[in-house]
Amino acid sequence: VLVMKPKILFIMHMPPPVHGASMVGQFIHDSELVNSSFDCHYVNLAVATRLDEIGKGGWHKAKGVLKKLMDVRKAVKSVKPDLVYITPNSAGIPFYKDFITVMMLKMMGQKIVMHFHNKGVATRQNRKLDNWMYKHYFKGVKLILLADALYQDVKRYVKREDVFVCPNAIPVISMANDEPKRTDAVPHILWLTNIMKTKGIMEYLSALKILK
């Protein structure tokens, strides 16, 4: 008996540029498990090609956004997916851009799962325009968050039963042939992310204190 795999349209950021959300998108795109379990189709949501372009506007960006909208619309009509997975932004100008994409998907009758790699909804929810947009943005969708604590950011608009928690991860790298190097020298540790409280800098410093 031929079993049809569910068709999923993944609308997500992939490199370039390289950042957390785009790397997770690349891991999903390259995942044997994901691609063998579902009939997968992909649209790269990224408009910026360099890190310094993220969050900025301009005519070039506007044309890029319009092209992405057309790409998404074309993919939905062609694939006719059972589910659309999208990694949108939660606040600011990038949110307004993604709001248009999400509302277009809803008008096309799509079932939507949003995977958030950032937060900021709670900081904007008391603004009249943003509040109105969030109500329509989150209506009838499922959410994937990176941690339980992040639910506080969206709880005004999304029921807890519509939220799934999936921490970020990286592919397993075999180190079987790497001999551990023991030395009395002071170790050098690289903190490769933003120096922000929400990125875990305080927990990182606490961990270093324990290691000492």
Where are these regions (language model features)?
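Short N-terminal targeting/anchoring amphipathic segment
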Residues: F10, V72-K97, Q110-V113, H117
